[in-house]
Amino acid sequence: MLDIKWIRANPDKLDESLSKRGIDSVSKSIIHIDSEKRTLISLIQKLQHERKEKSSSVAHIYDKSSTDFEEIQNDVKLINQKITELETSLLHHEKRLSEIMDNLPNLVADDVPYGTNSDMNKVLKECGTIQNIKFPKHHYEIGKNLGMMDFNTATKMSGSRFVILKHDLAKLERALINFMIDVHTTEFNFFEVSPPCLVKDHAMYNVGQLPKFADASFETTTGYRLIPTAEVPLTNIFANTTLLEEKLPIRLVAFTPCFRSEVGSAGKDVKGMLRMHQFGKVELFTIATPKESNREFEYLTAAAEKILEKLGLPYRVVLLCSGDIGFAAHKTYDLEVWLPAQNCYREISSCSHFSSFQARRSLSKYRELCSKKVNFLHTINGSGLAVGRTIIAILENYQNSDGSVTIPEKLRNYMGGQKLITPLTETVF
């Protein structure tokens, strides 16, 4: 959510930011509705004061049958009617303003490049060495040949975009989760938590998922939503709180299953594990003061990069352009991993700086150490990493011509010293 006071003072800057995203200007509408709303509030307050004075004067009239008493009563009645009319109009204006404000995206950072789509994103760096693999197989071919990636059985019980991982691939998934969290907690000082995977609508609103992306999540019949990312519960830990500046920044890491309806993804990545309704993800989250937030954004991104470095996976860092950046994001880096079978980079992590956008929705504040002033915090989050896509990257980048897959060295201790994943000779199902 944006600050209405800032919009009043900077309407042109708002429209400029919206224009970079390809959105029509709305500052005139906002300022007009806001002005009418403030006028209504002023009129209501004036009438309430007048009513109070008249009601007080009634107490000094001892003859309740007098003309003066009757006139004042009639005046108070008319004032009440007028207040009711104005309050109805005020509610209408507040609703109109709220609808516009709730659908306003975050301001784009000054260093975010202009662009209309992902083709105009800016590659900042490429890391790692791309191996020359002759006739590389797709991850789903490798998984099937190993006998450890079962889409058919999953589809029978759950429909499309689900998978069952078996034996060493299930073990690899567990190893990756533990490895990622160990790196983030021991090397980058993130604090591990295990949050709920079901939340109420207000928690989704606080991070910017609602109302705009209501159809992107799964909703239960009892008023819950399955989280699309651990960003939702982690951000809401600090909702309606005021933290002390000396306690900041706070860095959290969590592994959760994530659930997405993938509305609008028909025909995209229909084969394999790239786009699933359910997937595991290790999420990084930081809450910080505005003066620390840019540094913390770079720090969080570096933590996500470190996983790719340790696993020996080629990747690149991409700065998203104004037309590709997320609704709530101020600035975003995508980490894209190399997939040999697709002969291209694919997103494996998205790290975003949200400035005060989410904090204003969730009322997350801090008290300055010296001045004791209370201000809104800044939030930052990113994948560290998406576990399923990391499995994909390992299968494709570490595939061998005999059908086996080499386990990255950093994961071997997490897999009992195992060095290779070889095809199953028999399976229980």
From Swiss-Prot:
Residue runs in coiled coils: none
Which PROSITE patterns does this entry report, sorted A to Z?
Answer: AA_TRNA_LIGASE_II (PS50862)
Query: A biological process (GO) annotation for this entry?
Result: selenocysteine biosynthetic process
Please provide, in alphabetical order, the Gene Ontology terms of the cellular component aspect for this entry: cytoplasm
Top-level taxonomic group: Bacteria
Residues the record lists as binding ATP: 260-262, 347-350
Could you tell me which InterPro entries the record lists for this protein? Answer: aa-tRNA-synt_IIb (IPR002314), aa-tRNA-synth_II (IPR006195), aa-tRNA-synth_II/BPL/LPL (IPR045864), Ser-tRNA-ligase_type_1 (IPR002317), Ser-tRNA-synth_1_N (IPR015866), SerRS_1_N_sf (IPR042103), SerRS_core (IPR033729), tRNA-bd_arm (IPR010978)
Identify one Pfam family in the record. tRNA-synt_2b
Which reaction equations make up its catalytic activity?
tRNA(Ser) + L-serine + ATP = L-seryl-tRNA(Ser) + AMP + diphosphate + H(+); tRNA(Sec) + L-serine + ATP = L-seryl-tRNA(Sec) + AMP + diphosphate + H(+)
Keyword Kinase applies: no
EC annotation? 6.1.1.11
Q: In which pathway does it act?
A: Aminoacyl-tRNA biosynthesis; selenocysteinyl-tRNA(Sec) biosynthesis; L-seryl-tRNA(Sec) from L-serine and tRNA(Sec): step 1/1
The subcellular localization recorded is: Cytoplasm
Q: Which keywords annotate this record?
A: Aminoacyl-tRNA synthetase, ATP-binding, Cytoplasm, Ligase, Nucleotide-binding, Protein biosynthesis
Please tell me where L-serine binds in this chain: 229-231, 283, 383
Molecular function per GO: ATP binding; serine-tRNA ligase activity
- Supply the PANTHER family for this chain: SERINE--TRNA LIGASE, SERYL-TRNA SYNTHETASE
Q: How does it assemble?
A: Homodimer. The tRNA molecule binds across the dimer.
What does its UniProt record remark on the domains? Consists of two distinct domains, a catalytic core and a N-terminal extension that is involved in tRNA binding.
According to its UniProt entry, what is the function of this protein? Catalyzes the attachment of serine to tRNA(Ser). Is also able to aminoacylate tRNA(Sec) with serine, to form the misacylated tRNA L-seryl-tRNA(Sec), which will be further converted into selenocysteinyl-tRNA(Sec).
The family this protein is said to belong to: Belongs to the class-II aminoacyl-tRNA synthetase family. Type-1 seryl-tRNA synthetase subfamily.
**Protein name, as recorded:** Serine--tRNA ligase
- The record's gene field reads serS
